[in-house]
């Protein structure tokens, strides 16, 4: 919180829809997209990318730091859409070599491979920012981190829960629980 307060201009307002972002005057110098698998085509079930992850809601300068595609290739039907989005960035980077190659092949732009931002801090720095609420499970627990719908994980997690007796903690931004008794942590 101290770092955010001292170094970042974060809006007090929560935006729930693309049009809310597009309508509001955003008091920022630039729009930064990244990291994780924000450009993974598999997380978009309708076969189209989500324009919010490309910052298209604003005419401000756009930069991408360490985005990941999570796949070796982009489906042919999504390549033109991706090129249009990538063309709007003044600076691009990628979290892995294959992402850099995708950007080069589709948009003709160089994108250096950069370190995942989670690895830019030491363990002590992370611990100083970590939330240690009293309601986290004591002792061991099964941690599940999902990028998209839990689907096939649900029966496996149920089996693990039954075998170990450990509670399930779901660490992700999706709203669908992987296990009926999972504790969800939405702001990981």
Can you name each region flagged by the protein language model?
Residues 30-34, 64-66, 93, 143-145, ...:
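Structural motif
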Residues 129-171:
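Conserved catalytic-core segment of nucleotide-activated headgroup transferases in glycan assembly
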Residues 61-70, 102-103, 153-188:
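Catalytic donor nucleotide-activated moiety binding site of glycosyltransferases and closely related
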Residues 71-77, 119-133:
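Acidic anion/phosphate-binding donor-loop and adjacent secondary structure
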Residues 100-118:
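Helix-loop-beta element that forms the nucleotide-linked donor phosphate-binding surface
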Residues 1-84:
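Aromatic- and Gly/Pro-rich donor/ligand-binding loops
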Residues 89-96:
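A short beta-strand/loop micro-motif in the catalytic core of glycosyltransferases
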Residues 38, 98-99:
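Alpha-helix capping/helix-boundary segments
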